């Protein structure tokens, strides 16, 4: 059951204040008030701590958030088409594999973070619907005494074709969500979907709410990846699974050289021709190179509290699927 609105506001605002104040020195707390250590830190250290990267550019943390928002606001309407063009359609196979690796059953509660255009959510719904229909057929086969009319009526009376499954699509960008909602209507996905405007670093959901958390090609755009991972861990139920599909680092020198050539010389040109936006796709290419390699990202997932963390390289490591469990 969803929390009352007042509780949600407290969760969002209250938790944000709690983090901002750094907790306290009361028994059981492990962090001091932020001003307790300011005297020992130089202004240059404070400045560096507030800096991050936007592609290859060094920017303030606040500036990165607004820049990333602008990128996806600009590309939202051409986002899916550009994915097809940039990957030659291979991204579809990667996402299909992510769903097969998840193997969701009817009743699964999914949170798809940074999932604005709905690619993962729609695949999830199609998969669980097929699973639910297979389960129904098995059940009907065991009821040998039913007539065909009774079987047909039983199917007609089935109101929930998803077996109670729900895909919650959460994205920080309104334009991406707008595109996803329109796609859902166009593709006939009318049930089992929820659309939420939210920040990966401060999710507007209760603890232990979801069975699976997915994020596909989104986590490298987050300013504080460690906070996003901690939030993923928080909102998953005990036993829940974290799955991340993201670009990786290619180890083969020859393939890496060809990949760099294609990424830096071809993708921005495609972005300019198809979407009329060179700079946004230049950033997206640079953001891939700034993202941690597969082993380092695995360590970050473990640091967030996940266990049994593994990853699988796809297409020679151009992308990888990382998996972890909240145990």
From Swiss-Prot:
CDD domains: AdoMet_MTases (cd02440). Pfam families: Ubie_methyltran. It catalyses: 2-methoxy-6-(all-trans-decaprenyl)benzene-1,4-diol + S-adenosyl-L-methionine = 5-methoxy-2-methyl-3-(all-trans-decaprenyl)benzene-1,4-diol + S-adenosyl-L-homocysteine + H(+). One of its GO terms (molecular function) is 2-methoxy-6-polyprenyl-1,4-benzoquinol methyltransferase activity. Keywords: Membrane, Methyltransferase, Mitochondrion, Mitochondrion inner membrane, S-adenosyl-L-methionine, Transferase, Transit peptide, Ubiquinone biosynthesis. PROSITE patterns: SAM_MT_UBIE, UBIE_1, UBIE_2. It is a peripheral membrane protein. GO terms for biological process: methylation; ubiquinone biosynthetic process. HAMAP family: MenG_UbiE_methyltr. Belongs to the class I-like SAM-binding methyltransferase superfamily. MenG/UbiE family. This is 2-methoxy-6-polyprenyl-1,4-benzoquinol methylase, mitochondrial. It comes from Mus musculus (Mouse).
């Amino acid at each position: 059951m969803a929390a009352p609105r007042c509780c949600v506001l407290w969760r969002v605002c209250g938790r944000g204040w709690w983090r901002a104040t750094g907790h306290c020195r009361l028994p059981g707390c492990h962090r001091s008030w932020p001003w307790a250590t300011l005297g020992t830190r130089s202004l240059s250290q404070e400045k560096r701590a507030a800096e991050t990267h936007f592609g290859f550019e060094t920017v303030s943390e606040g500036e990165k958030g607004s820049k990333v928002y602008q990128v996806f606001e600009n590309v939202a309407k051409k986002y899916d088409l550009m994915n097809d063009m940039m990957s030659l359609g291979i991204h579809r196979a990667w996402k299909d594999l992510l769903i097969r690796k998840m193997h969701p059953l009817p009743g699964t509660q999914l949170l798809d973070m940074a999932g604005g255009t709905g690619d993962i959510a729609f695949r999830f719904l199609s998969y669980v619907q097929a699973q639910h229909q297979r389960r129904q057929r098995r059940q009907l086969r065991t009821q040998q005494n039913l007539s065909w009319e009774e079987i047909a009526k039983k199917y007609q009376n089935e109101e929930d074709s998803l077996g109670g499954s729900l895909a919650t699509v959460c994205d920080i960008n309104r334009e991406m969500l707008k595109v996803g909602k329109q796609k859902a209507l166009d593709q006939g996905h009318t049930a089992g979907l929820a659309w939420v405007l939210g920040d990966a670093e401060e999710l507007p959901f209760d603890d232990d709410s979801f069975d699976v958390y997915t994020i596909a090609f989104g986590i490298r755009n987050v300013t504080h990846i460690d906070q996003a991972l901690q939030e993923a861990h928080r909102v998953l139920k005990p036993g829940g699974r974290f799955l991340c599909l993201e670009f990786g680092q290619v180890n083969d020198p020859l393939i890496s050289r060809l990949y760099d050539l294609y990424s830096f010389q071809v993708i921005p040109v495609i972005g300019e021709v198809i979407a009329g936006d060179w700079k946004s796709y230049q950033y997206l290419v640079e953001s891939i190179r700034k993202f941690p390699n597969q082993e380092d990202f695995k360590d970050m997932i473990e640091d967030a509290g996940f266990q049994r963390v593994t990853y699988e390289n796809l297409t020679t490591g151009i992308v990888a699927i990382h998996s972890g469990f909240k145990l």
